[in-house]
UniProtKB/Swiss-Prot annotation:
UniProt keyword annotation of Repeat present: yes
Location of the MAGE domain: 88-288, 311-502
Cellular component aspect of the GO annotation: nucleus
Protein name: Melanoma-associated antigen E2
Biological-process GO terms, alphabetical: negative regulation of transcription by RNA polymerase II
Encoding gene, per UniProt annotation: MAGEE2
Stored Pfam families: MAGE
InterPro entries: MAGE, MAGE_WH1, MAGE_WH2, MHD_dom
Key words, A-Z: Repeat, Tumor antigen
């Protein structure tokens, strides 16, 4: 088993242990490498599935004003459990939540209501309000505005610089959208990929986020929000970094972020957080301008270089390139890989490379390691196979109908792609040891019967399988459909959609063969 596979399983077990009861401590490594303990409050978990806009449990407006005090008391109880040492900071964060709830339910906030909420801290109201106003500005993108000086009435107004949140307002509330924009901008400043540790370091350095407790006070379980919720919504991708021990992870822009957010918007957002202008990073500024122009041209042409299918296709192309140079074991420069992928894919190249690296590791026993991070030079390393894996591969021999046809048939019946787990549920009927599944898949992929695509929105990463080029060359869909019909004791016509596709496939092949014969024998 590869190092990544072992660490991924270990990581999954740790996460389960840490969040099993919704409370506990997580260890986030900061930039210096030392662990930082962060207390975690209860947070709803996002389901592991292709997600619609309901995936993340965003803040909801309180419908019944009578419930407001209950919610505030619950929030205060949680804040008290965090043992924040500065009572004024405690109250300022609680006041932020109070003002947001009042704004959502009533549209305005009375100073008398805030004083009543603060109770014994009301004599410290000016300082608490100053801190709360700063938090609203820096995290939520909201200005606290006086709308009636005589009645001491306030409301919350969105800042002009936060238009980025408008397009994702249906999925995320303002603070989460702001956090996402900050992380996306940070990724942009780090060459379109950012280590997880650097994200935590950023959150701990940006103004009010100088204490881990405050991060979780405002966002709930922030680690789950970044590594699970934003991932399953496809705003972020979260991948292992190969060649690191212990295993590290990095964040990239997800396909939805590429589609809905411009690079200049993200750059402006993160520059505001650093009290800088976007052109303070001239290289990234120019790349953002060019990248947004390229994106506009591609949308006009009806192309999406960042779509999941396109990136997975390019990843499999890189896999085949890597396999072709395996015997030489020569270093590969990133420019060579990018040239093979296509210059137009430069912005999403890290996404493509991570997919290819994961496929190589899981199914080919190869590790693509960046041996020179400054020059971006990679080396393809053969992983030593355990004796058990060697026996499994040798025992499989040449793929037979016993394995190939059921897998190809299931893929065809499931819409020409199927999750790997579903394949092994089928093969249990053939008394196939599920423990051998990666060995079987590895064998079939090496022989080009199958292609593998990681599902970037899943954490831990799942895979789907498709027909490979050899399968398309050696068999036809009708033959596979007839095999599955015999297996299930049905007729091919019992799957009308697949039957129609198989007939069209036969007709297309016959037409192609006729055309070839015409040119070979024009007489």
């Amino acid at each position: 088993m590869s190092l990544v596979s072992q660490n991924a399983r270990h990581c999954s077990a740790e996460i389960t242990a840490d969040y099993g009861d919704g409370r506990g401590e997580i260890q986030a490594t900061n930039a210096s490498g030392s662990p930082t303990s962060m207390l975690v409050v209860d947070a709803p978990q996002c389901p592991q599935a292709p997600i619609n806009s309901q995936c993340v449990n965003t803040s909801q407006a309180v419908q019944d004003p009578n419930d407001l005090e209950v919610l505030i008391d619950e929030q205060s109880r949680r804040l008290g459990a965090l043992r924040v040492h500065d009572p004024l900071e405690d109250r300022s964060i609680a006041l932020v939540n109070f003002m947001r709830m009042k704004s959502q339910t009533e549209g305005s906030i009375q100073q008398s209501e805030m004083l009543e909420f603060l109770r014994e801290y009301s004599d410290q109201f000016p300082e608490i309000l100053r801190r709360a106003s700063a938090h609203l500005d820096q995290v939520f993108g909201l200005n606290l505005r006086v709308i009636d000086p005589q009645a001491d009435t306030y409301n919350l107004v969105s800042k002009r610089g936060f238009q980025i949140t408008d397009r994702i307002a249906e999925s995320l509330d303002m603070p989460k959208a702001s956090l996402l924009a900050l992380v996306l901008g940070h990724i942009l400043l780090n060459g379109n990929r950012a280590r997880e540790a650097s994200i935590w370091d950023l959150l701990l350095k940006v103004d009010m986020w100088d204490k881990p407790q405050r991060i979780n006070n405002l966002f709930g379980n922030t680690r789950n929000l970044l590594t699970t919720d934003f991932v399953c919504m496809r705003f972020l991708e979260y991948w292992p970094v190969y060649g690191t021990n212990p295993l590290e992870f990095e964040f990239l822009w997800g396909s939805r972020a590429h589609r809905e957010i411009t690079k200049m918007e993200a750059l402006k957002f993160v520059s505001d957080a650093h009290d800088e202008e976007p052109w303070s990073w001239p290289e990234e500024y120019n790349k953002a301008l060019e990248g947004d122009k390229t994106k506009e041209r591609s949308l006009t042409a009806g192309l999406e270089f960042w779509s999941e299918d396109t990136m997975n296709d390019k990843a499999n192309d890189l896999v085949q390139l890597a396999i072709s140079v395996t015997e030489e074991m020569l270093p590969i420069h990133q420019d060579e890989l990018l040239a093979h992928t296509g210059k137009e894919f430069e912005d999403v190249f890290p996404n493509i490379l991570n997919r290819a690296t994961l496929i190589l590791d899981m199914f080919y026993g190869l590790s693509l390691i960046e041996v020179d991070t400054s020059e971006h030079i990679y080396l393809l390393v053969q992983q030593p196979e355990s004796e058990e894996e060697q026996v499994m591969l040798e025992s499989l021999g040449r793929p037979t109908q016993e394995y190939v046809m059921p897998i190809l048939g299931l893929i065809f019946l499931m819409g020409n792609r199927v999750k790997e787990a579903n394949v092994w549920n089928l093969l249990r009927r053939f008394s196939v040891d599920v423990g051998r599944k990666h060995s079987i898949t590895r064998k079939l992929m090496r022989q080009r019967y199958l292609e593998c695509r990681p599902l970037s929105y899943s954490n831990p990463v799942e895979y789907e399988l498709l027909w490979g080029p050899r399968a398309h060359h050696e068999t036809i869909k009708m033959k596979v459909l007839e095999y599955m019909a015999r297996l299930y004791r049905k007729r091919p016509q019992n799957w009308p959609e697949q039957y129609r596709e198989a007939v069209e496939d036969e007709e297309a092949r016959a037409k192609s063969e006729a055309t070839i014969m015409f040119f070979l024998d024009p007489t």
